[in-house]
A protein has these predicted regions:
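Catalytic-core regions of core metabolic enzymes
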Residues: 1-430
Length: 430
């Protein structure tokens, strides 16, 4: 059972996510092994790397050490690339010498559903938390810090190069899904981090969000996950993202019965009530996408969109041209408009929004925008929004309502909630 705690903050996770020295336990010269691939990926790292394996004297041109205790310096982070049975002893040694973080590749723990394997994972978590050692995994493919060129992962052919402007911090329980999403780099989308949590025996998705919320290199956060041990901790992390003006975009997997069953066998998490998660996401002002392929595109939009020039209230009009915007005003469709304050230039649309971006082809594809009355629309996820909007609105290819900063301004004196996560719009729907 997960012990109640607050999310880990940026300073507590720095040695895990942004280390200066790394030890690779189980380092191997055998091509194709996870340890060999991890060693290759660490070549781009600018800090010190210590291979650890008692069977070898040298690997990849570096002297190999017999144990962690034999290292000349205590590493910030230890990448553990050995079999499951040897992991617990290495974690104990990490804690003993004062290592800051550890990444565990090995699988076969709680995700198997076997009591002894679940207990083994719990012991690792207990050691880590008692000694202040932050652990990613087990059953984790690793961590990427694109900003520093760090790849603690056994995934082959990794792409690390990334721009810095409008960079997204990507958090995924599934390493395979996370690695797939990093292909967005080929399309010019910038990433600051790709963080895989696996079984999350210690560090989980909420902690990753907390870290990215306070990292200046990250401009927006994209989360894809199956379930979490503590919804309260996820909401705490979401509140931190809100407070630091970092839009949080979420795709929740395992929403159907079959998907929930797959989630349990994949990462060891019960997917949980979709209704409960949606309520939590709404309360923290998160942007929820219904399709996996929309996650990165939506996060990229919010990462690149500059804040409004002023704190003017009213309606944001998104149009392909100034003439189109003026036409809407002349026809009396817009009752109150602050379009001048929110004007943006292609290709980076302006005006961050707390929710409500259209990715589909029809009005039924609008995600996050619900019609509260014929005269006004409210940024509020509601089961009846499709029927209320259908036939009344013919939205453009991209529709953004409200402004992320305006939402924060409206709820500055209250915790993120429905009240703070809503913006009144004055658009006639007839």
């Amino acid at each position: 059972m997960d012990t109640p705690r607050h999310v880990y903050r940026h300073a507590e996770l720095l040695r895990l996510f942004d280390p200066r020295t790394i030890a690779l336990v189980g380092a191997s010269p055998n091509p194709g092994s996870a340890a060999y691939l991890a060693m290759l990926n660490l070549r781009s790292f600018g800090g010190m790397v210590y291979p650890v394996n008692a069977r070898h004297e040298q690997i990849d041109g570096k002297p190999c050490y017999r144990s962690l205790s034999a290292l000349p310096h205590v590493p910030d982070c230890v990448v553990i690339a050995v079999g499951r049975e040897a992991v617990e002893g290495i974690i104990e040694e990490c804690a003993e010498i004062g290592v800051g973080g550890a990444v565990i590749f090995a699988a076969g723990y709680a995700e198997t559903g076997k009591p002894d394997r679940t207990e083994q994972q719990a012991r690792i978590a207990s050691i880590a938390r008692q000694r202040g050692l932050r652990v990613a995994g087990p059953n984790c493919v690793g961590l990427l810090n694109h900003a520093s060129g760090l790849a603690m992962s056994f995934t082959p052919s990794l792409v690390l190069a990334s721009g810095t402007a409008g960079a997204i911090g990507l958090v995924s329980q599934s390493g395979g899904v996370g690695n797939g999403l990093t292909q967005a780099l080929h399309r010019g989308i910038a990433l600051s981090h790709t963080l895989s949590t696996g079984n999350s025996c210690d560090v989980d998705c909420a902690d990753c969000i907390s870290y990215l919320a306070e990292d200046p290199r990250c401009k927006a956060i994209a989360l894809v996950f199956e379930g979490v041990a503590s919804t309260a901790r996820l909401m705490e992390a979401g509140a931190l993202a809100w407070a630091n003006d970092k839009p949080l975009v979420i795709f929740k997997m395992g929403r159907a019965a079959l998907g929930a069953e797959a989630a349990l066998s994949h990462s060891g998490f019960v997917a949980g009530s979709n209704v409960a998660y949606m309520a939590a996401f709404e309360r923290i002002g998160a942007i929820v996408v219904d399709r996996y392929e929309a996650l990165i595109e939506t996060a990229a939009f919010f990462a690149k969109a500059p804040p409004p020039k002023t704190q003017a209230s009213g309606v944001a009009v998104v149009s392909a041209s100034g003439g189109g915007r003026g036409s809407r005003g002349r026809r009396g469709r817009v009752e109150r408009c602050a379009a001048a304050a929110h004007e943006s230039r292609n290709p980076q649309p302006g005006g961050r929004a707390a929710t409500g971006i259209r990715n589909g082809q029809e009005s039924a594809g609008l995600d996050g925008l619900a019609a509260r009355q014929p005269e006004t629309a409210r940024l509020h996820r509601n089961s009846s929004w499709r029927s209320r909007l259908r036939g009344r609105v013919r939205p453009p290819r991209l529709f953004v309502a409200g402004g992320f900063r305006q939402v924060r301004q409206a709820g500055r004196n209250v915790a993120p909630s429905r009240q703070a996560g809503s913006v009144e719009l004055g658009i006639r729907m007839d």
